[in-house]
């Protein structure tokens, strides 16, 4: 029996568009909506977390980890292999409204649109979230990786209350706890982190290849406080109380700096 292809995404001259969210295509969509600038790349997963099927991944060109290969009975076979490793989740966000956590696998949403614009390099996603019988939100997420200054990335969250009144909490920062799926664990050990309500930074190193990644984020748009956790997460928490028609936004600019070789390690502090 012959195979028949179905067209899930809309294709435009400069855009790929997803109209409506189908969980069956979640991981495929994450691949299609990936961003990269040859220095770093990030899959198109949901910033706010998602309890359905997902493969979160953010990668740095040339940043790898090593592992042993099961010994072969034949000569000349590899005993050690290197692989590009999942690094920091620099779009890490957790959103709560009136005590309800945003999770597209569980929440009632409508008017979902996600698109990537190849002319501008911008990935955007928007939808309406019905929090409860009285409260409804419109949310827009945007992100990009810089082509001019490859160490820089950006993300923006915009919200508008369509009805009701909302007490909104946004936890945003840098998450170095994400596992490398093939290994089933995070391949980094945290070296240091700091948070102050407006910025956060974290540094971590791979266990075997001894490669280091420094990530820092600066935020603006909402009042923030440091969010303390014992995990390898550097994040702040932002709060806004909004009535119907009111808007709020939170922007972040992220810097990612690698130490992958002898020269980069020697100049790491200066960079």
Predicted feature descriptions by range:
Residues 2-271:
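Beta-sandwich/jelly-roll carbohydrate-recognition scaffolds of carbohydrate-active enzymes
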